[in-house]
Amino acid sequence: MARKYPLDKFRNFGIMAHIDAGKTTTTERILFYTGVSHKIGEVHDGEATMDWMVQEQERGITITSAATSCFWKEHELNIIDTPGHVDFTVEVERSLRVLDGAVTVLDAKSGVEPQTETVWRQADKYGVPRMIYVNKMDATGADFFRCIQTVKDRLKANAVPIQIPVGSEQGFKGMVDLIKNVAFIFYDDLGKDMREEAIPAEYADQAEEYRAAMIEAIAETDEELMEKYLEGEELTIEELKAALRKATIANEIYPCICGSSYKNKGVQEMIDGVVDYLPSPLDVPAIKGTTLDGEEDHRNSSDSEPLSALAFKIATDPFVGKLAFTRIYSGVMQSGSYVLNSTKGKKERIGRLVKMHSNSRSEVESLEAGEIGAVIGLKNTTTGDTLCAENSPIILEAMEFPEPVIRVAIEPKTKDAQEKMGMALAKLAEEDPTFKTWTDTETGQTIIAGMGELHLEIIVDRLQREFKVECNVGAPQVAYKETIRSAVKAEAKYAKQSGGKGQYGHAVIEMEPTEGEYVFENAVVGGAIPKEYIPAIDAGIQEASKNGIIAGYNVINFKVKLVHGSYHEVDSSEMAFKIAGSMAFKNAMSKASPVLLEPMMKVEVTVPEEYMGDVIGDINSRRGIMEGMEALNGAQVIRAFVPLSEMFGYATTLRSRTQGRGVYSMVFDHYDEVPKNIQEQIAGSRAK
């Protein structure tokens, strides 16, 4: 079957932003203008098409990354809606992995906010080309130029306006298109009556200044254009657009435009920008992976190559069961066919294939290279798995997810719901890799862990709504970690020889702190320990490191070198060496200056000037480390690093200290050492 749209007419892009910058509204407007939505869904009414889980509609925030296909000027657009709330970083990470480009939505009155920085860094990691859409130009305090300055200052990005606003706040009525050198003025509220006009006289000088800066920025990325520009030749619209497209795809320029999605101004121009400047699947590098033998391999974006696809999200649908959102990188996926899940080494049957429009769907026979759709009927596939042709296996790069930073104990209100709760939690953990659940071996309690209080609230909410399990939830606890500060040598001998077959294992290790993950190195020479026992020592060390010696928390950032040991011809066994490894680790850790680490949150508080002293005093009392302050539209923005353990219940405190006028956001940043006196308190309370 011939393709409906050639590959260069595809745009797989996401819309990313800080919470409340207007991301869902912007997506809704795109769906409205591209003809998929017949009624504009308002977040304020809890009606937005993309926000399809009940919790999202109640809270007015986007949690699940829904993929939607729509069409614009002979292009197929696949939009991945990403949440802006910090607790759902995993959803953003997941979507960025399968996007080719992104639109970063900024709030015109706030500019770059903490979550914008987090998401921007994640996009940098995957090299995703971006354009910037400054939204809410009609709001009080809107300032396009200050907004762009925050991008340059805080994101260190080469933000180049390709539009400037005509008016702002209540008087926002259009924009100057600097490439075409004309103005677009709106004469109605639905954005339908937009007229192309000459640039209003009062904006002529400003437009000339910004157009010259834009042309220079574009010319700097292209030698031929630079020559023409320096010789004083006029650059054509086609030349500017082609060079800007190239520079955007190369992440050399981030084009900036403006609008007000809520007032339907500027959205169509933004969709034009997506088509004009963001990459098609052919513009991004071939997807990399490895063969089953570990050799490097890659696949080009083409229907004729063997199938390779990535399942980037698992969702449970009330009508059809498990849906696996999948990006096809190469080849064609047919419904009813068999594929290999190369990550798990299992064969899977593709039941049905659907293209999603938020939470409605249309069934299709096949998904081709560059497309994003959902697969129904997969039994063993989880987030991040590769699906590929059985006769041409490839494993695409896995996705990385952060470890949870907060945990709570949870129990069903009735004993007979225990099994039901266990199954429900397992299902939710399958959908969300940053959500973990386990049973505490000491207390027998079920523990759930995630990226923040809101994250866990929503999990508990879903247990009740979707799985009909009512739960009692304990107080939140911080996921502390332990580590060491000095290098040591230690040994342990495990010997039991009292008649009959004994046990014997002896290991000598060197342990030192590292920046990265755990590393085990075998440096035993001369066969002091037989090779088959080495993995057992490694396993013993890893098992023991799950319970550090200060307060029983997971130990991180250390390296072990096995340097010597001994064995017994008859009595040695894997179990004996595993125990010896575990004992050696504990001996080493006790001598290696062990310390407790706690998650530090990057906190940003915006308060009216008169409350600033009070709020800073409160942050200091929470062991906060001030990072800086800046004035913003008559308010003060305070930035600090504060331990997560000190932030529980902060929303209530801030409300009462600022009479409800202060707002804050926080995002996990790094682990830091806990002060000695507090370390002793934590260790003491854990020992009780």
Swiss-Prot record:
Keywords: Cytoplasm, Elongation factor, GTP-binding, Nucleotide-binding, Protein biosynthesis. It comes from the Bacteria. GTP binds at residues 17-24, 81-85, 135-138. Residues 8-282 form the tr-type G domain. It is found in: Cytoplasm. Its main location: cytoplasm. PROSITE patterns: G_TR_1 (PS00301), G_TR_2 (PS51722). The keyword Transport does not apply. CDD domains: EF-G (cd01886), EFG_III (cd16262), EFG_mtEFG1_IV (cd01434), EFG_mtEFG_C (cd03713), EFG_mtEFG_II (cd04088). It holds the Pfam family EF-G_D2. Catalyzes the GTP-dependent ribosomal translocation step during translation elongation. During this step, the ribosome changes from the pre-translocational (PRE) to the post-translocational (POST) state as the newly formed A-site-bound peptidyl-tRNA and P-site-bound deacylated tRNA move to the P and E sites, respectively. Catalyzes the coordinated movement of the two tRNA molecules, the mRNA and conformational changes in the ribosome. Belongs to the TRAFAC class translation factor GTPase superfamily. Classic translation factor GTPase family. EF-G/EF-2 subfamily. This is Elongation factor G. It comes from Clostridium beijerinckii (strain ATCC 51743 / NCIMB 8052) (Clostridium acetobutylicum). The lineage of its organism: Bacteria, Bacillati, Bacillota, Clostridia, Eubacteriales. The gene is fusA.
